[in-house]
UniProtKB/Swiss-Prot annotation:
SUPFAM superfamilies: MurCD N-terminal domain (SSF51984), MurD-like peptide ligases, catalytic domain (SSF53623), MurD-like peptide ligases, peptide-binding domain (SSF53244). It is found in: Cytoplasm. Pfam families: Mur_ligase, Mur_ligase_C, Mur_ligase_M. Cell wall formation. ATP binds at G112, T113, H114, G115, K116, T117, T118. This is UDP-N-acetylmuramate--L-alanine ligase. GO terms for biological process: cell division; cell wall organization; peptidoglycan biosynthetic process; regulation of cell shape. It comes from the Bacteria. Belongs to the MurCDEF family. Signal peptide: none annotated. The gene is murC. It is an enzyme of class 6 (ligase). It catalyses: UDP-N-acetyl-alpha-D-muramate + L-alanine + ATP = UDP-N-acetyl-alpha-D-muramoyl-L-alanine + ADP + phosphate + H(+). Pathway: Cell wall biogenesis; peptidoglycan biosynthesis.
Length: 478
């Protein structure tokens, strides 16, 4: 007899991927609980939905639980994992639970080293505007929905497919997007780029024969795997051979304007697009969404409206507005999750296009010692060539042990030797808000970048300066 699963407990509930799955299951009627090491806005929001949350991991948190879901950050010696094993409660990896969710709808999976979250969000937004009411699970907060997941009534589920731990190989989509393939999370693949490429091929081969692969052929590695595909392919990019192609691309403030040519199958009329995102990399992300829309016959007007009204994703080129600088002027703070050299370069280039002639101040917290080691020279090259001033924090370890010559000070020294910028090393991330306030000048664009605790910095800068403004005003009124 099939065991009825009613209560599902998530270990690491505060993570973007975990919280989204939990919320969808909660809306499906399951009893959901979960724990995380520290409290967060995500936990508080889920608690507000009626999900039982715990701060800290303890065996006592598992009460009448039928299944446990773990993220890759949760180790086998976690007390809740040990308690579940002792009680013979199934312990399920996050990706397997996501795969179970996808079985009930037609899955659209977005994979790639860079741009997954934004592309997933754009696809979900286009489908929603087209009246398809998709379910979605995204690795970031979709601003228009106020959440990173939603249970829709339509036939489709749009998910972000994670290659970092090879867990995307558990998914069985009917449509898959690959934005690019780059060297990251190489420890998962035995530091062999061939293994990484093969994983993407295997991921695409998991689709049924009637599935569609939507591939960015601007990416050289994606082009290399095209001959290995047996399913139908739609290519997209800026290159002349792409079936869904952008031409006449131009930056207009913090937006991108372009014309989309659509030649996958029957040639469709050119589509003029106003994308409410900055950067050429986001034009590619939008083309992926347009390619999906063509496959699903989403009306052109809905595609145009979804892209022009797109309000972004949390921690992706997220503006905190203009703030008072010490010299009497104003500066702008923008946060971005980018933490790989390719992402840093794309985001800073987007900032150049959106704010021409402005000084770019990069406040950067490297993420993981292993990535800092593997991409060290690329970080030096990208930061030196794209930023006008640099505030550099120590590496966010993400559970890793420090690696000699792959720390923040070593990166600062290398940038100094390169000679294009004079970095300021900020020993503690807690001191970064003050360092930003001290460095910012009138007209500056301060880019806070990284996947770690630097995400808390912009709000602290805003709070500091608002407090100072209140004190000044009170002094003037006294």
């Amino acid at each position: 007899m099939k065991h009825a699963i009613k209560h599902i407990h998530f270990i690491g509930l505060g993570g973007a991927g975990m919280s989204g799955i939990a919320e969808v299951l909660h809306n499906l009627g399951y009893v959901i609980s979960g724990s995380d090491l520290s409290d967060s806005a995500t936990l508080q929001r889920l608690a507000g939905l009626g999900i039982q949350t715990f701060v800290g991991h303890a065996a006592a948190n598992l009460v009448d639980v039928d299944a446990v879901v773990t993220s890759t950050a949760v180790h086998a010696d976690n007390p809740e994992v040990l308690a579940a094993r002792e009680k013979h409660i199934p312990v399920v990896p996050r990706a397997l639970m996501l795969a179970e969710l996808m079985r009930f709808k037609q899955g659209i999976a977005i994979a790639g080293t860079h741009g997954k979250t934004t592309t997933t969000s754009l696809v979900a937004s286009v489908l929603a505007e087209g009246g398809l009411d998709p379910t979605f699970v995204i690795g970031g907060r979709l601003n228009s929905a106020g959440a990173n997941a939603k249970l829709g009534s339509g036939d489709y589920i749009v998910v972000e497919a994670d290659e970092s731990d090879a867990s995307f190989l558990n998914l069985l989509p009917v449509m898959a997007v690959v934005t690019n393939i780059d060297a990251d999370h190489m420890e998962t693949y035995g530091h062999d780029f061939g293994n990484l490429k093969k994983a993407f091929v295997d991921f695409l081969r998991r689709m049924p024969f009637y599935g569609t692969a939507i591939l960015c052929t601007d990416d050289p590695v994606v082009r290399q795997i095209v001959p290995e595909m047996s399913c139908p392919i739609t290519s997209y990019g800026l290159n002349e051979e792409a079936q869904v192609r952008a031409i006449n691309v131009r930056a207009v403030g913090a937006q991108m304007h372009f014309t989309a040519q659509r030649r996958n199958g029957v040639k469709l009329p050119d589509l003029d697009v106003v994308l409410n995102l900055a950067g050429q990399h986001n034009v590619l992300n939008a083309l992926a969404a347009i390619a999906v829309a063509v496959e699903l016959n989403v009306p052109d007007a809905a595609v145009q409206k979804a892209l022009s009204d797109f309000t972004g994703v949390g921690r992706r080129f997220q503006s905190y507005g203009e703030l008072p600088a010490r010299d009497g002027g104003r500066f702008t703070v923008i946060e971005d999750y980018g933490h790989h050299p390719v992402e840093v370069a794309a985001t800073l280039s987007a900032a150049r296009g959106a704010f021409p002639g402005r000084r770019l101040v990069l406040a950067f917290q490297p993420h993981r010692y292993s990535r800092t080691r593997d991409c060290f020279e690329d970080f030096v090259k990208v930061i030196s060539s794209h930023a006008d001033a640099v505030l550099l924090a120590e590496v966010y370890a993400a559970g890793e042990t420090p690696i000699v010559a792959a720390d923040g000070r070593s990166l600062a020294r290398a940038l100094r030797v390169a000679g294009k910028v004079e970095p300021v090393f900020v020993d503690s991330i807690h001191d970064m808000p003050q360092a930003i306030v001290d460095a910012a000048q009138d007209g500056d664009i301060v880019m806070c970048m990284g996947a770690g605790s630097i995400g808390l910095v912009p709000a602290k800068v805003v709070a500091m300066l608002q407090f100072q403004e209140v004190n000044v005003l009170e002094g003037q009124c006294a």
